[in-house]
Curated annotation (Swiss-Prot):
NCBIfam families: lepA, small_GTP. Residues 10-191 form the tr-type G domain. Pfam families: EFG_C (PF00679), GTP_EFTU (PF00009), GTP_EFTU_D2 (PF03144), LepA_C (PF06421). HAMAP family: LepA (MF_00071). InterPro entries: EF-4 (IPR006297), EFG_III/V (IPR035647), EFG_V-like (IPR000640), EFTu-like_2 (IPR004161), G_TR_CS (IPR031157), LepA_C_sf (IPR038363), LepA_CTD (IPR013842), LepA_IV (IPR035654). Its main location: membrane. It is an enzyme of class 3 (hydrolase). One of its GO terms (biological process) is positive regulation of translation. GTP binds at residues 22-27, 138-141. This is Elongation factor 4. It is a peripheral membrane protein. It catalyses: GTP + H2O = GDP + phosphate + H(+). GO terms for cellular component: plasma membrane.
Length: 604
């Protein structure tokens, strides 16, 4: 096999594709791969960069993928390293870490939709990383495409000169060659010193069944080869290099070395991705670099929920399944917890509601588990009367009211872009969700950008669905965490037959407690089947009952066999039945259907 000659750094381009969800990012990636013949026509399929079934079904990108492309321009061979990124707000950490390894980004905007909230958010991440941004207007072949207006939109909203914008149609394969040439002429080559000691940033890691934990790295300085011993700076441990590869969605391409400026996969024979944490630095064990790469933001969970197996004996199976998913998802964390109502399960941290849905669906589909998920919550900062601070992510952990000095809840800054005709409905929704308006800006005659600060708790329940319904699906939404603010919060408990069902407890704004409690008990009354005894459903704050509904018992005619008119005999039987029901009520357990736990999500 002929030894490959290293690609000169001046001929390497590392770039990402950033876009709002559904703007045709994965289709554009497919076109660039096909144009560069990185995958044969026989193996090429749509959304080749989306490798999970769930990504293909939902039409979304969850896991950032990379591919090495070779392209010849003006007689010179170039290497283009393409990193596809997710578009949904929950997976913006995947975007930020992918952009750390690039010099440029294609900003894809749908010619029929214009700039949307997530486009703006990802652009700011790219600008913070000093990336060269190349605007790309996609779907120009559609009859309702409005290219001129979108160009103006890009300039007015983001402040990027639209003059350089490339017009393409990924579906119809228009403008792809021009775009590849623009990438080469516009995006700068990587900087770095090939003669310095090795410094490589781990910007992704995952678990391979055959090779163990793999690190996707960008070589910032120096180079790496298969003969080297490597030091992982975060752990201080040394490992031999078992293999080096170029990334490709279908198969890893082996190589003997990775040079300065390149992107590649490193196999060190490790059993867990925790040994090669994302954001860590690899260096040469013999001649290490003086300090690791800084400024990398790790993913932090934003939403927490309890996951419990319906078959209680499958607790260990759930643990195994979560551990397997965690191998490829550094943002997923979990710890065991128990609930009086649901038994043993796990408190799981997610990036957002979509991330939670995806994880729950994968656990049920890939590991054949039947799960109950409790209502999602955020982390509250609870200041106690003894001047200590407790962080609470499970409502059942909230200390008694007389021990609490104040509670602070996390806030986010939300950016929403909406057609102006829905502005009234949207502002009403934001006010209902305790939003505080910071800015309102008309992008053009028909579109408005709103900036609000909102309690995180208000957006983790049903905000996204309500936003879509009050704007007929036209509004786009993005958020970033800002700070914790003091709030007037209480714990709302639900009691069924006198017992608090801990899995149904929620932390809520005090002014909304009565309304939510009333709606909750009314819904529960419809969902819980009638028992042989009377069941009281109560909503309480502290020891105070604020709402109550009663499920009447199923009647049994105990006097049916009493013929004749002896009223005392009938009365005796009815009294006996009443005594029996009283005893049953004291010891009877009420089975709650799964819908009861989901009821909290559905109630505004």
């Amino acid at each position: 096999m002929k030894e490959k000659t290293p690609t000169p750094m001046k001929n390497i381009r590392n770039f990402s594709i950033i876009a709002h969800i559904d703007h045709g990012k994965s289709t554009l990636a497919d076109c660039l791969i096909a144009e560069c013949n990185a995958i044969s026509n026989r193996e090429m399929k749509s959304q080749v960069m989306d490798t999970m079934d769930i990504e293909k079904e939902r039409g979304i990108t969850i896991k950032a993928q990379s591919v090495r492309l070779n392209y010849t321009f003006k007689g010179e061979d170039y290497v283009l390293n393409l990193i596809d990124t997710p578009g949904h707000v929950d997976f913006s950490y995947e975007v930020s870490r992918s952009l750390c390894s690039c010099e440029g980004a294609l900003l894809v905007v749908d010619a029929t939709q214009g700039v949307e909230a997530q486009t703006i958010a990802n652009t700011y991440i790219a600008l913070d990383n000093n990336l060269e941004i190349l605007p790309v207007i996609n779907k120009i072949d559609l009859p309702n495409a409005n290219v001129l207006e979108v160009k103006q939109d890009i300039e007015d909203t983001i402040g990027i000169d639209w003059f350089n914008a490339n017009e393409v149609s990924a579906k119809a394969k228009l403008g792809i060659k021009d775009l590849l040439e623009k990438i080469i002429t516009t995006i700068p080559a990587p900087s770095g010193d090939p003669n310095n000691p090795l410094k490589a940033l781990i910007y992704d890691s995952w678990f391979d069944n055959y090779l163990g934990a793999l690190a996707l790295v960008r070589i910032m300085d120096g180079s790496i080869n298969t003969e080297q011993e490597i030091l992982v700076m975060g752990t201080g441990k040394k490992h031999g290099v078992l293999g080096l590869y170029y990334p490709n969605p279908l198969k890893k391409i082996p190589t003997k070395s990775l040079e300065c400026g390149e992107i590649g996969i490193v196999s060190l024979g490790l059993k867990s991705v925790t040994d090669i944490a994302v954001g860590d630095t690899l260096t040469d064990a013999e001649n290490p670099t003086s300090k690791p790469i800084e400024g990398f933001m790790p993913a932090k969970p934003f939403v927490f929920a309890g996951l419990y197996p319906i078959e209680t004996d499958r607790f260990e199976d759930l643990r195994e399944a979560l551990l397997k998913l965690q191998l490829n998802d550094c943002a997923l964390n979990f710890e065991p917890e128990s609930s009086v109502a649901l038994g043993f399960g796990f408190r799981v941290g997610f990036l957002g509601l979509l991330h939670m849905e995806v994880i729950k669906e994968r656990l049920e589909r890939e590991f054949s588990l039947n799960l109950i998920a409790t209502a999602p919550t955020v982390v509250y900062e609870v200041h106690l009367t003894d001047n200590s601070i407790k962080y609470v992510q499970n409502p059942s952990e909230l200390p008694p009211e007389n021990h609490i000095a104040c509670i602070k809840e996390p806030f986010v800054r939300a950016t929403i872009i909406t057609p102006s005709e829905f502005l009234g409905n949207l502002m009403q929704l934001l006010n209902n969700k305790r939003g505080i308006q910071e800015k309102m800006e008309y992008l053009n005659q028909s579109r408005v950008m709103l900036t609000y600060s909102l309690p995180s708790n208000e957006i983790v329940m049903d905000f996204y669905d309500k936003l879509k319904s009050c704007t007929k699906g036209y509004a786009s939404f993005d958020y970033e965490p800002i700070e914790n603010r003091e709030a007037n919060l209480v714990k709302l408990d639900v009691r069924v037959a006198g017992d608090v069902v801990d899995a149904l407890s929620i932390i809520i704004d005090k002014n909304k407690a009565y309304e939510k409690g009333r709606a909750l008990v009314e819904t529960m009354k419809e969902l819980i089947p009638r028992q042989l005894f009377e069941v009281a459903i109560q909503a309480s704050v502290g020891n105070k009952i604020i709402a109550r509904e009663t499920i009447k018992s199923v009647g049994k005619n105990v006097t049916a066999k009493c013929y004749g008119g002896d009223i005392t005999r009938k009365r005796k039987l009815l009294e006996k039945q009443k005594e029996g029901k009283k005893r049953m009520k004291a010891i009877g357990k009420v089975e709650l259907p799964q819908e009861a736990f989901l009821a909290i999500l559905k109630i505004d």
